[in-house]
């Protein structure tokens, strides 16, 4: 590997700009479809856009602030000294692959990735487990560096420090590199987005890309008619399964009667009363319009609906029947008013 640029005096914007020039360790899990918080679709749009994806939150802030502490605890536990990398590195064999290492192990061809973990996610590290997207990240670092092994030190708040050693597996690395290079060659370079995964992140990305609508424009969806048919088929299946699920829940309630709780091998069931207070917005708007307006805000969004032809037919028949019933009632009222009960 080679040292691409020092990060000691690198601005956040320049750091983000360099990361757009290739695939980084945090991109790896998303490209493989292993990251529950980010997808290949999101990585793609980050790479091709002119803007910088400066994502930050409290968990990420704590991770940065506690990186030194985790590294110190790793040294205490293993006796291995570490040093900062202070650079963005690039694979010489595969220049597309970039990396920004947390720490390098002094005197060894090895590195360290520091993690902080919520106690609510402790089960993901239990019994020797490592979250899949972190495994992808570490293997990416092994691919960039050509090192023999990489360590992960995960501080689970209030519980323990978990340390794992991952050794180089050529087959795994070759597979990872092939998928990353395929993503870059067939998606990023020709600017052809990968298929969305259905994740919430992908929905947010699409809504951000197309936040406004043109009411004078209608798209021809014939080329993807098969997708619409597939969606309708899935919707029908979901509706049937939801009804079956509701039927089962009703049977369970009949079995429980007035019992608040129920048990069966492998199951705990509760059916308890609860109370909650909700704001009656219509009444508040009517009786206290000033207060309602003061705490109200306009939210703009695009509503997405798909209506199948069968639903059009149902709506037409329902509307036609309702109209006939309305006319019949009007005629009946007229006859009764005029003492004429002959309805024709």
Identify the residue ranges that each predicted region occupies.
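Accessory terminal regions of nucleic-acid processing enzymes
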Residues: 1-327, 341-344
């Amino acid at each position: 590997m080679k040292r691409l640029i020092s990060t000691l005096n690198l601005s956040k914007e320049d750091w983000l700009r360099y990361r757009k020039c290739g695939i980084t360790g945090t991109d790896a899990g998303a490209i493989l479809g292993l990251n529950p918080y980010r997808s290949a679709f999101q990585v793609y749009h980050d790479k091709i856009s002119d803007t910088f994806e400066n994502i930050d939150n409290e968990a990420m802030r704590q991770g940065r602030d506690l990186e030194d502490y985790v590294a110190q605890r790793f040294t205490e536990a293993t006796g291995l000294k570490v040093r900062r990398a202070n650079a963005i590195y690039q694979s010489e064999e595969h220049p597309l692959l970039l990396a920004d290492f947390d720490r390098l192990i002094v005197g060894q061809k090895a590195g360290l990735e520091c993690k902080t973990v919520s106690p609510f996610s402790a089960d993901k590290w239990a019994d020797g487990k490592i979250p899949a997207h972190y495994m992808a990240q570490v293997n990416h670092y092994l691919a960039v560096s050509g090192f023999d092994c990489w360590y992960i030190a995960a501080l689970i708040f209030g519980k323990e420090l978990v340390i794992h050693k991952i050794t180089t597996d050529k087959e795994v690395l070759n597979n990872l590199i092939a998928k990353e290079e395929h993503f870059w060659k067939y998606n990023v370079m020709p600017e052809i987005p990968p298929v969305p995964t259905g994740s919430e992140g992908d929905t947010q990305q699409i809504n951000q890309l197309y936040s406004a609508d043109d009411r004078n424009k209608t798209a021809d969806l014939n080329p993807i008619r098969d997708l619409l048919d597939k969606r309708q088929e899935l919707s029908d299946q979901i509706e049937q399964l939801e009804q079956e699920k509701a039927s089962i829940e009703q049977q369970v309630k009949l079995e429980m009667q007035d019992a608040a709780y129920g048990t069966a091998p492998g199951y705990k069931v509760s059916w308890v009363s609860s109370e909650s207070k909700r704001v009656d917005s219509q009444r508040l708007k009517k009786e206290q319009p000033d207060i309602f307006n003061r705490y109200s805000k306009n939210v703009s969004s695009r509503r997405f609906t798909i209506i199948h032809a069968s639903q059009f037919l149902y709506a037409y028949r329902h509307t036609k029947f309702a109209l006939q019933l309305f006319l019949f009632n009007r005629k009946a009222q007229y006859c009764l008013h005029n003492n004429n009960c002959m309805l024709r």
